[in-house]
Structures are given as C-alpha cells and as structure tokens.
Amino acid sequence: MGPPSAPPCRLHVPWKEVLLTASLLTFWNPPTTAKLTIESTPFNVAEGKEVLLLAHNLPQNRIGYSWYKGERVDGNSLIVGYVIGTQQATPGPAYSGRETIYPNASLLIQNVTQNDTGFYTLQVIKSDLVNEEATGQFHVYPELPKPSISSNNSNPVEDKDAVAFTCEPEVQNTTYLWWVNGQSLPVSPRLQLSNGNMTLTLLSVKRNDAGSYECEIQNPASANRSDPVTLNVLYGPDVPTISPSKANYRPGENLNLSCHAASNPPAQYSWFINGTFQQSTQELFIPNITVNNSGSYMCQAHNSATGLNRTTVTMITVSGSAPVLSAVATVGITIGVLARVALI
C-alpha cells in the first residue's frame, strides 16, 4: 500500500466530504476526555457497495493506528496499520485489498460482501504507550434482485374463482410488500397473505379486484419492485336495462330501443318480440309502427366468457290513431298540389 496522505482517486465524492468534515472536527476540537468511538456510514450496506468506518474523539498524542477484524486486538486479525509520522500504511493478515486507511484513522472498505458483516476494532497508538481502542460494526445485506409475479389465474370469473399471486424469488431476511393500483394492499377478509407474505391470495374475486398488482422486496439496505401484472376479472352480464322507458306509442311513430348490461367482456345482445327471435344487435329499430307491433320486447345479454345470460322485458303498447296533419300543413300541401297542376 502506498502512503494514504490523501484520498485515492477512486474515492467517491461523498466519502471525501465525510472525511474532510471528520478531519476538521478533529483539528478544531480542543483536547477532551471524550471516549473514542467508531461510526459506520452506512450501518446497513448493500452487497457490492462501500462502507466508511469513521473515528471520533481521537486522542491528541496519537502516533499511529491499527484496524482489526473482530472485537479484539489480535495480530492474525490485523487489517492494516498506519504510522502518522511517516504516513506509511502496512497491510496485515486480514487485509483483502479492498481497504483504505486515511490519516484521520477512518477505514474505507469497498465492494463489501456478506462475509464483511461484523465488528471492527480501531487501536490508537499514543506516545505515552497507553493505547486506546474502540469497536464499531456494520451489516451487509444482499443487493436485492428485481422481483417478478406469477399467477395461477390472470382471468378469473367473479364470485367463482380464487387467484394466487406469488412474488419471486425467495430471499432470506427480506420483507415482501404488495401494491394494488399503486396503493398499499387494502384490508379485506378476502385478501390473504402467506408464505412470509410472498403469496397473495384473493378469495372469490370481485370485479373491483381488477387492476395492476406489484410486489416489492426490501431489506435494511435496498429495495426493488416488480413490473405490474394486470388482473382481468370476468363478470356479468348484469340484468340489462332497456331504454327509453317509454311504453305507449301511437301508430306511425318510430320505435328505437337500446339494451345495455355491465359485462366483461362486453355482452352480446339478442332481441325477442312476443317470444320470437328478431335480431342480434344492441339496438332495435322499427319504423312507422302499427298496433300489430304491440307486445313484449325482451333483450337477452350473453357473456361468452362466463357463459351467463340475463334478460329483461318491456311491454310496448301501440294504440290510438295516426297523427293528423294540422290545418296549416293541409293548406300548404293543397297549395303545393295546385301550383304543380297550374304548371302542367
């Protein structure tokens, strides 16, 4: 190792700022009897990242430092030693090539692994040979992968099917969370979590359960969320409605009826008059009706996915006489006819 008189170029800017702050605090603070302490930044670190062990309240008469892996000073656990006077760092048996010691006694460990989890001890060597020691620690968690969701049924039928979502992969010491349409999971007796929250089960699905589902995995050092999975709930048809609700007509009017039923996928419609099939359309149009068009008009809605049919019936009565032309209209027609005769 070369002399760590200045942070190496590979050091990220945040560590430079932290080290500078620590150095200034050490320089400006007057001698105190405060106890030597170690701060880990961060305390929880993701695998592959880096962690900085900061020393606080260094004694004034220090002449060197030694860092050890573990909670006690042991030659076999020595990571690196540093002599202030010569600014020389000497690696020990526990040195892995990922550690960098700084003049303010801070230790940077890069590309951490889960094996790095644990305690680290700093020994400050003083000119009076009354050395001081302090121990710090940090925890390394795995860098979480992007999870994915599998489902046993992405097109369930309302009030008939149950759906089980599973968030994968399984990772130890990890929290599993679920999101529905971008919101946290609602409280419902039909929603059940199991297998450490990895599995979300929807019992007897409802149409309101349709939407986007995501799972998120978390540990104290990182988090990751899956791509959304869409749940398409098949339902209906509900009992259809016929509009307009008008029931009484006069001869010569036009009859225009429309049928609608809530359904997923959209319903297919059929019309029956007095029990006789007429046509398969959502609208029924009969121009210039007569009294013979009176009767029962039934609309049938069919869902090809659920296999269900729903019907509704309206009674249409055609009575009275055809609309009579007004006197003004009659005079207008007469004048028009006479004018055509005169031209001939």
Curated annotation (Swiss-Prot):
GO terms for cellular component: apical plasma membrane; azurophil granule membrane; cell surface; extracellular space; membrane; plasma membrane; side of membrane. Residues 35-142 form the Ig-like V-type domain. Pfam families: Ig_2, Ig_3, V-set. Residues 1-34 form the signal peptide. InterPro entries: CEA_cell_adhesion, Ig-like_dom, Ig-like_dom_sf, Ig-like_fold, Ig_sub, Ig_sub2, Ig_V-set. Disulfide bonds join C167-C215, C259-C299. It is a lipid-anchor; GPI-anchor. Homodimer; homodimerizes via its Ig-like V-type domain. Heterodimer with CEACAM8; heterodimerizes via its Ig-like V-type domain. Belongs to the immunoglobulin superfamily. CEA family. This is Cell adhesion molecule CEACAM6.
